[in-house]
Amino acid sequence: MNKPFSDNTKPTKKHPQRRRIVYIIAIIIALVGIGLVFYAHRNLTYDHGTQAKLQQAGFQEKQAKLPDGSVLNYGEGPANGLALVLLHGQQVSWEDYAPVLPELAKRYHVYAIDYYGHGGSSKNPMKYSATAISTDISWFIRQHIKQPVIISGHSSGGLLASLITANVPDMVRGLVIEDAPFFTTEKGRAESTFSWRSFKDMHDFLASGQSNFTQYWLDHTYMQTLFNAKDPNAWDKIVKQPALQYMKQHPGKIPRIWYYPPELQVNTLFDLTANMQDKTGEYDLRFGQTFYNFSWFNEFDQTATLKRITKPSILLHVAPPTQSGSYYDEHGVLASAMDDKDAQRVHELLGSKNKLIDNIKSSHDIHKDQPKVFIEAIDEIARH
């Protein structure tokens, strides 16, 4: 027979240690969740504050209308020193210089210009050549800035800055060339470069009748060969499938994948596909097509142009990619703007007034990856 419970039986004790463990786990889960929210927010909005920062630094977006009706869009900073003209690289706009503009604006009067086919400037293919663009920017310098300038150009903007310096030396104090594709854009050499193959994608897309360039790019870009060098499925897993899934859920939008931080530059790859033709951006793919068929280079002799430059200049040139240690991939395709021999040739053609700063540990965008190096180069030219 079971004994009845005695009156003095104590109630079962709860386990405070177990409860504390549960609380700690709950807090950890909450913190991880909050961390993921902040992580995703940063990855999705890392560039959303650009305009506010530029306005805070005193920049205003303006437009100049040329006698023939063409429009040059530009960002102008406060008048805090010598005039400085900045010419961006291809597929972006003047805001691409945002990482260095606030600092430069403290001691220069900055004019960051969208050249034709980009940003808010005219989209007239008749103007898509080095000679036409450099002529009109020279007009802008003479008619609007009205004083000699320091001029710097990135990538194809560096080609333009060099041509302007050669053509109107009375309106230029000095030149900074940022990783410009000298000689590698010439017919016979260009076909073995990553850049030319990218322009071929633009040409082929325009001829295809398809409506979404980002999707076309995902299927055809030579970039997938670089990604798949060690893993044949890397491009699909890392880039293509996440992008296609995003575009399925957000039709007409450029992919922005929440789990990729800006340092990996995967979302930057997507951003560079934004274009006027499919209404995702302001870049005119017909501009890139002129690099594919070489019409952009009509009457532009790169060697002769460099020889004609008499102003002080600095050439900034990046080091080979750290992954491969070479400017070329395993198929002999140039994956950079120039190799070391090209940079040395530019340096020699520019003569004794040129300084070559080589092997900069940076991607193609030195002003973003190494802003201090870029700003110091501008300051050095200003001291001449």
PLM regions with names:
Residues 67-68, 75, 115-152:
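Active-site loop/oxyanion-hole signature of alpha/beta-hydrolase fold enzymes
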Residues 287-305:
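Active-site nucleophile elbow and catalytic-triad environment of alpha/beta-hydrolase enzymes
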